[in-house]
Each structure stands twice: as C-alpha cells, then as structure tokens.
C-alpha cells in the first residue's frame, strides 16, 4: 500500500473580485480563469510546467463561456502545455475549495505529484438558458437565469425538499437558530470594517493579480482592487434596509453576500515535487471533509463538515488560529460559529472581512478562502487554519491547513 504523503500549497493568487456588471463584466469567464494560472506561471519562470499532473478548477455555473470543462480551456489560454490535463469540479459554492481538496487528496494518495487548483465564476456573464420543447410546436418553453439558484426544477425535489431561494434558506437558518436582525447587521458591519481596514493598508495586494480588462466605450482598464466592499457602511444604514426574501424577515442586501466575478488559483505539490521544481512550501493541506444537511437550511452545512474534519484530524475548534468561513449570509455565518462554539466577534474569524464585504463569486470563493487563510497564517504567525463554507441544496465543506 502506498504511504500517504504530505501535500503543500506553494503559492496562491487571485483576481480582484468584481461587482455584478462591474469592472470584470467584459472579461470572458474562461479568460478570467486563465489569469491567476498565468500569474503563477510568471511568478515561477524556472518551473517545468509540462510536469503538471493536473489542473483542477471549481465552477458552479458551466452554462456559458465556462462550458465544456473550463479548467482545460483556462490552462490552454494560460499557456500551460497542451499535454497537461484539466478537470472542472462542481459542488456549487464550495467548488473552488473542493478543487483544492480533490487535488490534494490525489497527491496525498500518490496518484499525482504536482497540480494547480482553484476556481472561477463570472456571475455577470451567466447566460439565460432555455429548455428544448418536448413536443412539436410547443409554446411552453422554460427560460432560466443561471446567475444564481434553482433552474429546471425537478417536481419530486420540490415536493420532498422544497426549492427555497438562497435568501429564504438564510431566513430559515435565522429562524431555526434564533439569529436576530440586529446580530446579523452587526456581523455584516464587522465584515465591512475589517475589509475596509485591510484594503486601506494594502493587505490584499499580496494575493491579488491586476486584471487588464476591456472597459467598454471607455477603453481598457486596470483592475487591481476588490469592487464590492463598502467601507463607509454604518449600523444605522444597515438597519434601514428592507428584507427582500420575506416580510417580516431579516435578510437584506446589507447582511448577505454579493453576486460577483473572480478567479483564484494555488500551486499544490508533494515534498519531492516542490523540491524538484524549486518551490517553497507555505502551508500543508491536512484534509478536507464534506457533509450534508436539509436543503432548506443549507447554511448550517459547515457545522457537520467541520466536526467531521476535526474528528478525523484529532482537532478541536480552539486549535485553529485562523478561521475563514464564507459569509453567504450573516445569519448562517453566526449560526455556524455559535454551533461550533466560536464568539460572534472573534478576532481570528474572517479578520480581513468575508463575503458580505468582499463578495461571493460562487466557484472562486472556496479557493479565495484557502489562499486568504494561507496569507493570514503567515501574517499572524499562526499554525492552523480552517476554511469552511455552506453549499446550496444542503451541504458543507471544510478544509484544514497548517503553516510550514
């Protein structure tokens, strides 16, 4: 039997996160995915990139320019030799995190040595789709917006599990776990304040690759900062926003994540591959775990996935020096932290803001959590980090990393 091997993250970069219809709106999704890969290649010119065993990218949509295996398209567009294979994985919101976990697992098992993993999503460029007619001359064609949420709903799924919108699932979590509107708004404000402070200090420059983007009539533009944060947000301003999923309700545009565009990529290698290619290990991937919950409370998914991962690794929640939890909604972020025994305002949780401030490009977000955690461990001198996120239709994924 092959002995399990250590897996290392050796470098990690991302694009800025664009607003819906914002600065990255004119960048094709496959081109967007290629940008962080190309940046990694440029940062390591002495590496023989033909030795890559796999490029693994997460993507939640795959109905538009991200069709037909966007990982393969992206690696070719990035100039990686055509002999290198690529695969796209889809676990909706956790696709990018799962891509890293899948590649790490293959390295750990000895199937591969050297990989690039990450994720991409252009929610701006998500297309409308139309089902084919089931009979001649039908006038009942169904058209769906693929930006977010359900489409082409199976009636059995609807009857047995419900097809609540993402915001409605956030309301369900708020109700079931008694998360108040005031607590949600306070959580959202902390996200904005922390992201604003990080941006003002230039903290994200270490992980962001500037994007030369078509600018429409204005011509090309250079995008080098995240567009979504609103650092001037106030508690009073958040309190004025109306709930948009239910009335009465608690989920607002201010305490929910955004609809965004972005891409991220990391280099993964075994110890021997890192040495062979002159790469410096920065973090060890300890493991990944997934779990499932009822679709109507999908936001609580990080709780069982994190518990499963901790049990497997022999860790406790207090062992993590840094936690990056995806803020799909403040309600679910708070519910998860409370269930795991973490304070609402814990300084080591999303210390530079989360998805409420930075944005949530679905397939990219998990990879962003992982790379932000790697940089965060180095900044803090910490040892262990947890990246975790909920997943639409009721799942959770968690990944543990150790600074080296």
Residue ranges and their predicted role:
Residues 2-78, 85, 172-181, 191, ...:
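Conserved active-site "lid/cap" helical segment
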Residues 90-121, 174-203, 265-272, 337-338, ...:
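Active-site-proximal alpha-helical scaffold in enzymes
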Residues 114-172:
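Flexible glycine-/small-residue-enriched beta->alpha junction loops
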Residues 27, 59-115, 147-150, 160-166, ...:
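Conserved catalytic cysteine-centered active-site region
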Residues 14-15, 25-26, 30-35, 46, ...:
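N-terminal extracellular/periplasmic Venus flytrap/periplasmic-binding protein-like
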Residues 171, 207, 215, 286-357:
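Active-site pocket-lining segment
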Residues 1-29, 148, 234-300, 304, ...:
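Condensing-enzyme catalytic core mediating Claisen C-C bond formation in acyl metabolism
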């Amino acid at each position: 039997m092959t002995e399990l091997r250590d897996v290392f993250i050796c470098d990690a970069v991302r694009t800025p996160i664009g607003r819906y219809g914002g600065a990255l709106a004119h960048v094709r999704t496959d081109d967007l995915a290629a940008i962080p890969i190309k940046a990694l290649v440029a940062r390591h010119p002495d590496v023989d990139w033909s030795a890559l065993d796999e490029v693994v990218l997460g993507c939640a949509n795959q109905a538009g320019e991200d069709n037909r295996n966007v990982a393969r398209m992206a690696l070719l567009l990035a100039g990686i030799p055509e002999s290198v294979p690529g695969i796209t994985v889809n676990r909706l919101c956790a696709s990018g995190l799962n891509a890293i976990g899948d590649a790490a697992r293959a390295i750990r098992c000895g199937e591969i040595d050297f990989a690039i993993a990450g994720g991409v999503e252009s929610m701006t460029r998500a297309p409308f789709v139309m089902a084919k007619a089931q009979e001649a001359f039908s006038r009942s064609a169904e058209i769906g917006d693929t930006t977010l949420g359900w489409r082409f709903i199976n009636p059995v799924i609807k009857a047995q599990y419900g097809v609540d919108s993402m915001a409605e699932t956030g309301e369900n979590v708020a109700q079931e776990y008694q998360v108040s509107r005031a607590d949600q708004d306070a959580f959202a404000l902390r996200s904005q304040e922390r992201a604003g402070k990080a941006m003002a200090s230039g903290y994200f420059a270490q992980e962001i690759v500037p994007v030369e983007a078509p600018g429409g009539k204005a011509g090309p533009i250079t995008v080098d900062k995240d567009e979504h944060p609103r650092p001037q947000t106030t508690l009073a301003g958040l309190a004025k926003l109306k709930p948009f999923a239910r009335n009465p309700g608690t989920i607002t545009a201010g305490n929910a994540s955004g609809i965004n565009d972005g891409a991220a990529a990391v280099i993964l290698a075994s110890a021997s591959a890192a040495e062979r290619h002159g790469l410096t290990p920065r973090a060890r991937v300890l493991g990944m775990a997934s779990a499932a919950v009822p679709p109507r409370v999908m936001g609580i998914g990080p709780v069982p996935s994190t518990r499963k991962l901790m049990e497997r690794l022999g860790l406790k929640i207090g062992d993590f020096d840094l936690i990056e939890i995806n803020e799909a909604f403040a309600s679910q972020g708070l519910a998860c932290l409370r269930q795991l025994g973490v304070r609402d305002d814990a300084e080591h949780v999303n210390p530079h803001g989360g998805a409420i401030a930075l944005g949530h490009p679905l397939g990219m977000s998990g990879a962003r959590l992982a790379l932000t955690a790697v940089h965060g461990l180095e900044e803090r001198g910490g040892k262990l980090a947890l990246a975790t996120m909920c997943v639409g239709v009721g799942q959770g994924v968690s990944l543990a990393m150790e600074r080296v």
